C-alpha cells in the first residue's frame, strides 16, 4: 500500500464556484459544534531548548555542498539548511495515528541524485506498535510518498545507532536494500515504491543469535548495515558486490557478488563481537566498528578492524586498549568515518566509556596510529547553554564533510557537535567544536505550566529536568539546583502564581535526595521539600491549593499524600482509588478534584484535600489513558476533564456534563479569552467531527476551530496549555519534537 504525505492543498485550488443549493445543503448538514468559518491559521515554532534527545544517524550528500541529513530515535528526521544554518524538520506532518513513524530506523541518500532521500520509519516492534514504512522523497524531504511494510521497525530500540540498514545502489538509484530486525533483507527496484524479501539471505539474520538482551527482555537487532561497493559496477547497472552486517557475535559479515542473489561469509573476519558500522575509503578499503552489544544502553567491549578486499586481509586497528583494572569499566567502539577526500584520514568513537570519558580518535595513516581528539578540544556551548553540564556520550555516528576536511559531525545522546578546525588539530591546535543543533528539538516534555505572572512558560522535561523559559526563542540553562533527572510534574497555586512545585526522578539518588521541589519566585530559585511521603518512588503528580497552603503529591507506586508544610509532615488522602489524577481548584482553596480512568468516576474534596467523595462519572475508559483535570482560572467550582473516547467533560454547579461534538479528548488547556470579557479559550488535542487535530473554542465548547494543519501535526500532542496572558497562544508537548507554541497568523 502506498500513500502520499504532503502539506495542505493551497486554498485557491480547493474548489471553484459552488452551486447555491449545495452551499445551503452543506450549511444545514454541518455539525453545530463546528465553526462555520475556515480553520484558524496559526504559526508554529519550537520553544528553543536545543537538542535534548538521541540523534542516531548522520549523512552528508557526497556531491552537493551543504546538504546533510540527521535521523533521531523519537523525533523524526531533519535536513540541514546551509543558508539559515538550521535543521529543518521533515516529518512533522505525521499525526497521532502515525506517531509511531516518528522514530527513524535508517536513512539513505541517492549519491547521484541529491533531491532523493529515503527514510525507514517506525519506532517500536512491540505488539501494540504499528508496522513501519519506507518514506521516499524527490524534493529533499519537502514531501514524501510512503510504502507501508508488513513488519515493525525499532527506531527507539536497541541498536538504533547502528547503520545504515537502508541503502541506495550508487550505480542504479532505482534499487534499494533494507536490512530489518527480524524479517531478513528486503529489496525495491522502483525507488522504494514496492518491496519484496530477498530469498536466500543468511538465516542468522532472523535467529536468536541476532538478538540482544535489553532492560525489558530480548530484542531483535538483525541486519544493521547494508553497503554497496560502487567500484564493483558501473553507472546504469546494478552493483554486483554488496556487504551486509548482522548484529551477532558469530559470523556477522556477508557478501554477495551477484547483486544480492547469493551470499557467503567474508573470510577471515573477527568473531566474538557485533559490528555496528562499515565505511568505505576511496581506495576500496573498508573499516568496521564493533561492540559486544549493539548499544546504546550498554557496550562493554569492542574493536576497530580494517578489511582490504584486494588481499582478503583483516587488521585490528583498535585505537585504545580496554581497561585492565578489573573494575568492569570496559567500552565499545560506536562508529567509524573515512574522509571522502583522503582515505587515510579516519575518525572513530568510543562507546560507553565513562572512565574517564568517551572520545573520538583520529588517524592520518589508515589506522596505524591514532590521536585522541576530545581530550584536546574546546566546546562552544553558547548555542544551548544547558549542554555545558553534559559530556559527549552515545557517540553512535560520525561523518566528515566531503567538501570541508575541517568539519566533522558527531552525534550524542542530546544532539550534534561539529568541528571547525580538524586540520589545524593535526598541526597541534586544540580542536574547536560547536553545538550544531539549531532547529533540531528532540526533548520529550512531560508537563507544562504557563503562569499568570513571571516567565511565560515553565517546563518539566524527560532526561534533562526542565526550564524556565523567559524568552521562548532563546535557549537557556536548566533550573537552578536542586536538580532532577526527569522532570515529570509541575504546578502552581491559582491565587499565588509565583509559588510553583515540581516533582521528578533523580538518577542514582546517592544521597536520598527529595524528589519534590518548591519555588517562591516563579521558578528562578528552588528548594527541596523537607521529606517525601512514606511510600512511593518519587515523580508522579503534584498539585497545590489555590492559596498555596496545601500540596497533594501522588508519587509513583503510591497513593495521594497531603502536606501543609512542604513535606514536614504527611497525611494520606482518604477516599480515592489508586492512580486517580488530582487537581486543585484555582480559586477555592478548600476544593480539589480527582478523576479515575479505571472507573471514569469524578471525586471532589471540600475539606482542603483531606478526603474525597464520589461526585459523578462517565464510565470506564481505560487505565492506559492518563486523564487531565483543568479547573477554570477565575471561577470556583468549574473544571474541564479529558476522558479519551468518552470525550471532553465539564464539572459545573455540581454536575458533570459531556460537551457535544468532541468524540475523543486526549489533552486540553485553558488560555486567555480571545475577546475582552469573554470566556477562557479552550485548546483541545482530540477528535471533532471525525478529524483528529488541535482545536480551540471561545464559546465554552459549543463551536470549535481546527488550528493545526496537515503539514504541522508533530506526531503525538500532549500537555496542551493555553497562555493566560496572551490571547490565542497555545503550548503543547510532543513525543520527541520538543515543546511547540503557536500564535494566530
Regions found by a protein language model. Name each.
Residues 18, 36-745:
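Extracellular glycan-interacting surfaces
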Residues 4-5, 28, 604:
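The N-terminal extracellular segments of secreted preproproteins, especially immediately downstream
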Amino acid at each position: 500500500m502506498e500513500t502520499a504525505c504532503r502539506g495542505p492543498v493551497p486554498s485557491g485550488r480547493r474548489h471553484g464556484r459552488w452551486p447555491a443549493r449545495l452551499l445551503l445543503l452543506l450549511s444545514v448538514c454541518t455539525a453545530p459544534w463546528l465553526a462555520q468559518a475556515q480553520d484558524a491559521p496559526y504559526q508554529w515554532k519550537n520553544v528553543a531548548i536545543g537538542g535534548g534527545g538521541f540523534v542516531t544517524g548522520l549523512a552528508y550528500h557526497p556531491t552537493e555542498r551543504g546538504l546533510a541529513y540527521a535521523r533521531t530515535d523519537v523525533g523524526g528526521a531533519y535536513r540541514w539548511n546551509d543558508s539559515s544554518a538550521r535543521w529543518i524538520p521533515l516529518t512533522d506532518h505525521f499525526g497521532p495515528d502515525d506517531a509511531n513513524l516518528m522514530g527513524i530506523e535508517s536513512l539513505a541518500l541517492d549519491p547521484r541524485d541529491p533531491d532523493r532521500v529515503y527514510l525507514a520509519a517506525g519506532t517500536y516492534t512491540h505488539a501494540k506498535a504499528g508496522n513501519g514504512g519506507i518514506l521516499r522523497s524527490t524534493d529533499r524531504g519537502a514531501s514524501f510518498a510512503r510504502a507501508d511494510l508488513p513488519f515493525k521497525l525499532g527506531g527507539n530500540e536497541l541498536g538504533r545507532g547502528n547503520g545504515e540498514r537502508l541503502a541506495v545502489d550508487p550505480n542504479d538509484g532505482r534499487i534499494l536494500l533494507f536490512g530489518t530486525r527480524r524479517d531478513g533483507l528486503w529489496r525495491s527496484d522502483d525507488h522504494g515504491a514496492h518491496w519484496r524479501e530477498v530469498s536466500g539471505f543468511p538465516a542468522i539474520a532472523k535467529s536468536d543469535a541476532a538478538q540482544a538482551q535489553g532492560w525489558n527482555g530480548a530484542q531483535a537487532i538483525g541486519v544493521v548495515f547494508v553497503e554497496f561497493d560502487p567500484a564493483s559496477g558501473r553507472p546504469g547497472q546494478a552493483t554486483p558486490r554488496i556487504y551486509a552486517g548482522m548484529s551477532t557475535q558469530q559470523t556477522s559479515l556477508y557478501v554477495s557478488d551477484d547483486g544480492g542473489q547469493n551470499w557467503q561469509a567474508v573470510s577471515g573476519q573477527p568473531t566474538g563481537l557485533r559490528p555496528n558500522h562499515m565505511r568505505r575509503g576511496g581506495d576500496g578499503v573498508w573499516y568496521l566498528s564493533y561492540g559486544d552489544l549493539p548499544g546504546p544502553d550498554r557496550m562493554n567491549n569492542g574493536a576497530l578492524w580494517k578489511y582490504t578486499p584486494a588481499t582478503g586481509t583483516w587488521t585490528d586497528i583498535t585505537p585504545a586498549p580496554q581497561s585492565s583494572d578489573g573494575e568492569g569499566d570496559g567500552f565499545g567502539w560506536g562508529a567509524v568515518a573515512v574522509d571522502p577526500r583522503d582515505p587515510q584520514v579516519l575518525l572513530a568513537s568510543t562507546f560507553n566509556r565513562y572512565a574517564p570519558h568517551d572520545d573520538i580518535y583520529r588517524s592520518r595513516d589508515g589506522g596505524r596510529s591514532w590521536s585522541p581528539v576530545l581530550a584536546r578540544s574546546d566546546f562552544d556551548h553558547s548555542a544551548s547553554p544547558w549542554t555545558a553540564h553534559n559530556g559527549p556520550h552515545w557517540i553512535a555516528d560520525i561523518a566528515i564533510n566531503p567538501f570541508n576536511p575541517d568539519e566533522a559531525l558527531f552525534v550524542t545522546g542530546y544532539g550534534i557537535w561539529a568541528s571547525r578546525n580538524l586540520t589545524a588539530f593535526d598541526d597541534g591546535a586544540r580542536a574547536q567544536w560547536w553545538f550544531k543543533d539549531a532547529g533540531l528539538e528532540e526533548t520529550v516534555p512531560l508537563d507544562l505550566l504557563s503562569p499568570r505572572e513571571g516567565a511565560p512558560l515553565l517546563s518539566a522535561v524527560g532526561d534533562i529536568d526542565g526550564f524556565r523559559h523567559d524568552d521562548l526563542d532563546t535557549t537557556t540553562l536548566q533550573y537552578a539546583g536542586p536538580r532532577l533527572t526527569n522532570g515529570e510534574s509541575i504546578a502552581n497555586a491559582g491565587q499565588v502564581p509565583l509559588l510553583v512545585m515540581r516533582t521528578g526522578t533523580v538518577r542514582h539518588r546517592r544521597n536520598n535526595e527529595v524528589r519534590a521541589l518548591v519555588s517562591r519566585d516563579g521558578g528562578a530559585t528552588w528548594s527541596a521539600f523537607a521529606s517525601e511521603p512514606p511510600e512511593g518512588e518519587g515523580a508522579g503528580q503534584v498539585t497545590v491549593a489555590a492559596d498555596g497552603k496545601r500540596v497533594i503529591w501522588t508519587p509513583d507506586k503510591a497513593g495521594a499524600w497531603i502536606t501543609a508544610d512542604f513535606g514536614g509532615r504527611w497525611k494520606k488522602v482518604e477516599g480515592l482509588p489508586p492512580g486517580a489524577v488530582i487537581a486543585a481548584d484555582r480559586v477555592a482553596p478548600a476544593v480539589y478534584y480527582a478523576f479515575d480512568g479505571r472507573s471514569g468516576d469524578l471525586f471532589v474534596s471540600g475539606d482542603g484535600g483531606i478526603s474525597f467523595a464520589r461526585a459523578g462519572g462517565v464510565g470506564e475508559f481505560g487505565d492506559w489513558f492518563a486523564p487531565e483535570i483543568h479547573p477554570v482560572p477565575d471561577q470556583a467550582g468549574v473544571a474541564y476533564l479529558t476522558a479519551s473516547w468518552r470525550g471532553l467533560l465539564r464539572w459545573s454547579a455540581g454536575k458533570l456534563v459531556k460537551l457535544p461534538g468532541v468524540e475523543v479528548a486526549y489533552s486540553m488547556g485553558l488560555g486567555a479569552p480571545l475577546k475582552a470579557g469573554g470566556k477562557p479559550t479552550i485548546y483541545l488535542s482530540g477528535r471533532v467531527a471525525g478529524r483528529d487535530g488541535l482545536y480551540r473554542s471561545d464559546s465554552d465548547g459549543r463551536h470549535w476551530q481546527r488550528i493545526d494543519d496537515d503539514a504541522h501535526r508533530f506526531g503525538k500532542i500532549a500537555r496542551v496549555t493555553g497562555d493566560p496572558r496572551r490571547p490565542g497562544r497555545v503550548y503543547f508537548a510532543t513525543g520527541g519534537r520538543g515543546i511547540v507554541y503557536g500564535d494566530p497568523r
